[in-house]
Design a protein with these regions (language model features):
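Structured, helix-rich domain cores that form ligand/interaction pockets
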Residues: 1-286
Length: 288
């Protein structure tokens, strides 16, 4: 089952998907984990689909198969490290009866340690505008747990055309990082009608802003535990937005109130988040 979820019934609204998953498993059925067991028990794939490559992260070797990397042959206490990129995740989703909540429950059954989990929300309707977000930040109309952010404006040297717009909250090593960027510019498909149609972009009003939430270590594991819990009734997008709501909001200035946290939330942000609830990442164990 695809995790690409339409958050509203209309076309060109918002889509939410898991876009990265990294985890480490040390034992399977009481014995040291092996790459073969990761393939058969966790991924449920065939050995023949993988080729051997040089390792990384302290592992001597890795097995690779189109967006899926299994790092092995490290120190005895390192276990096996599984890394699934966005392309690999789309591959797994295309399998019959596949779901990420079941995948994660199975991984937790083998005492997996989730080390990174990325969630992407694609706004193809026009709720988020990169120039508006930058203007809000410049005017101090952003309330956040993050102390700083950095903005990147990428241009083509040949003619000065804008080639990319990005805002980062947090660093690459932060346990929580947000990245908002113009996916249409990043993909370079703003004038390619065929590719826009393939990516479900409104040709008459092309818009594609991606909001990426990158979680690491405890935050990644806690989010995965929530999502894998059979008692959880929230869709992926609802969960992600509640986490975002706990870290970030854009507001409208009020000259009569110096407390920025009391300023009214900007309408565009209210429409994008679509919830007043917040999700604080505290642990709860899922049921098998």
């Amino acid at each position: 089952m695809s995790l690409k979820v339409l958050l509203k019934s209309e076309v060109y609204i918002m889509e939410c998907l898991l876009d990265w998953c990294s985890l480490t498993i040390k034992k399977i059925y009481g014995k040291p984990a092996t790459w073969e067991k990761i393939v058969s028990e966790v991924l449920e794939m065939d050995f023949a689909q993988f080729t051997e490559l040089k390792g990384n992260y302290g592992y001597k070797l890795q097995k690779y198969s189109e967006g899926i990397r299994i790092y092995y042959d490290g120190n005895e206490d390192m276990g096996i490290h599984l890394q699934i990129s966005g392309d690999g995740m789309r591959r797994l989703e295309n399998r019959k009866n596949f779901s990420w909540d079941s995948f994660l429950r199975n991984a937790f059954f083998f005492d997996a340690k989730i080390t990174r989990l990325d969630v992407a929300i694609d706004d193809k309707k026009g709720y988020l505008n990169m120039d508006v977000l930058n203007d809000k930040i410049n005017k101090g109309e952003c309330v956040s747990r993050f102390k700083t952010c950095n903005t990147i404006h990428k241009q083509l040297i040949v003619n000065g055309d804008t080639a990319g717009k990005t805002i980062n909250f947090g660093s690459n090593t932060s346990i929580v990082k947000f990245r908002i960027y113009d996916k249409l510019l990043e993909q370079g498909i703003q004038r390619d009608l065929v590719k826009m149609k393939e990516n479900n972009i409104d040709i008459l009003n092309p818009h594609w802003i991606r909001f990426e939430m990158q979680l690491r270590d405890d935050r990644a594991e806690i989010f995965a535990l929530y999502y894998a819990n059979p008692d959880n009734k929230l869709e992926l997008g609802e969960m992600a937005k509640r986490v975002i709501n706990n870290y970030l909001k854009f507001v409208d200035a009020n000259e009569f109130d110096t407390n920025r946290s009391r300023w009214n939330t900007s309408q565009f942000w209210t429409r994008f988040i679509d919830t007043l609830e917040k999700l604080k990442l505290t642990k709860q164990k899922p049921k098998k």
